[in-house]
Amino acid sequence: MMNPPYSMGSRNNAALYELSFTGHLLDSITRDGKVIVIVPQSSVTGKTKEEQAIKDNILKYHTLEGVISLNKNTFYGVGTTPCIAVFTTGIPHHKEKLVTFINFEDDGFEVQKNRGLVETSAARDKKQHLLDIWFSRTEGGSKFCVKTTVEPEDEWLHAFYYFSDSIPEKSVFQKTMADYLTFEFSMFVQGRGDLFENKKDNDNSITAGLINDTEWERLADKKWREFPLTSVFETIQRGKRLKRNDHTEGCVPYISSTSLNNGVDCFIGNTEGVRVFRNCLTLANSGSVGSTFFQPCTFIASDHVTKLENKNFDRYIYLFLAAVISGISEKYGFNREINDLRIKKEKILLPVNKKDEPDYIFMGAFMKQLEHELLHRYDIHNSGANSSGASH
């Protein structure tokens, strides 16, 4: 077992990467030996070509058994989020081998004021559960353990391979629709109703009808299947960096990584060196990572958001997808953003039709019915308030 020296590696000196030290250790152990290393999670993500080459070389001669993601406070006060990687030496990694990836961030230790890192009463049971999963004595949900094949360019971490197979609750979609309607109303109140003058262009005949009450409430009754984001959206493109000091006065929404106000950070007038989009989703790739919003009007995208576009979708389908995609936020955070590689690997769970294809008709009609319900509820409330006022 080893904790390699702190990385001083670079493109010009790849030998000083933690992973390079790990490779040297593996090469030094006799065949079929077990090697355990504790390294920063960043060392197994393989951000550079040099690091990916090291990972590729390790797999040529040794077997990766598994990686355990640890509590970010394991080395309290250091500011490094570690993981444990386990290898078998001298045996080339078979491409079909299932590698065990475990999320052990919740290990039963917590930081307490004036005491530092403290072991709680739950720590022992959590450790036993970890061992039972590792040695296949029991089954664990995918949120805790994922077993999968690996590639050198992959990030050897649970978060990279984890995919939630939980069907979103109806309340998730209700909130997405309510938040969007609130944003739209807010813009009208602020005198920015012209932003939505092309609103009808965002509607599609695919959602021309409403499905009945008994069907649209039963999300769980639909068959769901996973799909890569790259198969759902025709275009996935990051916005462009624009320093705040370079903003000019204007009336075009500037979408950044905020989780509030439909992602609108401010309004600007820049026309050069910017990326302008319309009628698509924006996904926060940093900051409030995972926050996803439908953008019906022309906007300027910062580099902190990624555009997700399919020209065949209307606003109702987009809103359904926004609710689903927002769920991936649990995998990300301040220390783990959505880069181009991660988004290409990302998958979402969608309802399917009889052909096992995404049921966009259901998605659109479902959200249209939700909109109808929310607006009807508002009309009843508004009518009641007016009647009450008139009686006085």
Predicted regions and their residues:
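A conserved structural/catalytic subdomain of Rossmann-like adenosyl-cofactor enzymes
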Residues: 4-205
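A short beta-sheet element
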Residues: 265-320
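Short, conserved charged micro-motifs
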Residues: 93-95, 313-319, 354-359
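A conserved beta-strand element that flanks and buttresses the S-adenosyl-L-methionine
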Residues: 1
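Non-catalytic DNA-recognition/assembly elements of restriction-modification systems
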Residues: 144-239, 245-261, 354-392
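General detector of folded, globular domains
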Residues: 226-229, 254-255, 282-283, 293-294, ...
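Glycine-anchored helix-breaking recognition loops at helix->coil/strand junctions
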Residues: 169-171, 198, 202, 304, ...
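Conserved hydrophobic/aromatic beta-strand scaffold that supports enzyme active sites
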Residues: 84-86, 254, 282, 307, ...
